[in-house]
Design a protein with these regions (language model features):
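A conserved beta-strand/loop element that lines the FAD pocket in flavoprotein oxidoreductases
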Residues: 1-6
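FAD-site-proximal beta/loop scaffold in flavoenzymes
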Residues: 8-19, 24-100, 192-195
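Extended hydrophobic-aromatic, low-complexity segments
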Residues: 45, 139, 177-178
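Residue-level detector of short coil/turn "hinge" positions at structural boundaries
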Residues: 49-51, 110, 188
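Mid-to-C-terminal Rossmann-like scaffold of FAD/NAD(P)H-dependent oxidoreductases
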Residues: 74-174
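C-terminal alpha-helix
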Residues: 101-105, 185, 198
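A short, polar/charged loop-to-alpha-helix boundary motif
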Residues: 172-190
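Cysteine/selenocysteine-centered motifs that mediate thiol-based redox chemistry or coordinate metal-sulfur cofactors
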Residues: 188-218
Length: 218
């Protein structure tokens, strides 16, 4: 069912199906929304503020008009993985962009170093965290671990000697470590094997790097 979308949700007390814009009806017991985000930029339409999919900003979250800033889902911030500005519609990125915009508006120079896609949610008691790129091209290696007994699923995506994404289901304890590795574009070639076995921790890092991550190099 391509080239169409949901026009109406069917059912009274619970969902029984959907009506598509092309007139087709589909029966279902569950409806999951995952159709992406299109920023509402009507506020700056037909103005001097430059827009693309979202409002175009620089590393200080400034728009093309002096004195006007934008942040959050409506702005196109720098994506560390795509290496270009794009909409980063997640709460952590919105918080950081808002902070940077606020500091600069208050006269305190600040730079948005960049972000990437990151989502955390819980379905039916199962925590899920996803981050980074899925379906990337190039020298890609994916490490997957599935444990049916504990209902856990883990996938880490490597490109060369960098981690560019991961998916964790029902065991998200090490997601913070991976998020930091992606954010800082760390070369993990020296300890990639430890990361791939899914039982890693800071103890798996080389001594110098472990010291930097835990104590800031002190």
């Amino acid at each position: 069912h391509l080239g169409t979308t949901v026009a109406e949700i069917l059912g009274d007390d619970k969902v029984s199906g959907v009506l598509l814009q092309n007139g087709d009806e589909l029966s279902c017991d569950m409806l999951i929304f995952a159709i992406g985000i299109t920023p509402n930029i009507d506020l700056v339409k037909d103005t001097a503020v430059e827009t693309n999919k979202g409002i175009v900003v620089d590393k200080h979250m400034r728009t093309s008009v002096n004195g006007i800033y934008a942040a959050g889902d409506v702005a196109e911030g720098y994506d560390l993985l795509f290496k270009k500005n794009r909409v980063l519609a997640t709460l952590p990125n919105a918080y950081k962009q808002g902070e940077i915009a606020g500091l600069n508006m208050a006269g305190v120079p600040a730079v948005f170093a960049g972000g990437f896609a990151y989502n955390a949610i819980s379905f039916f008691g199962f925590p899920i965290i996803t981050a980074g790129l899925q379906g990337a091209e190039g020298n890609i290696r994916e490490e997957v671990e599935i444990d049916e007994e504990t209902c856990t699923y883990k996938k880490i995506i490597f490109k060369d000697d960098n981690i560019i994404g991961f998916i964790f289901l029902n065991d998200v304890d090490r997601a913070g470590i991976l998020t930091g590795i992606i954010r800082d574009s760390l070369d993990v070639g020296e300890f990639k094997g430890h990361l791939a076995d899914m039982k890693f921790g800071y103890a798996s890092f080389p001594k110098k790097l472990r010291k930097e991550r835990l104590f800031g190099g002190v």
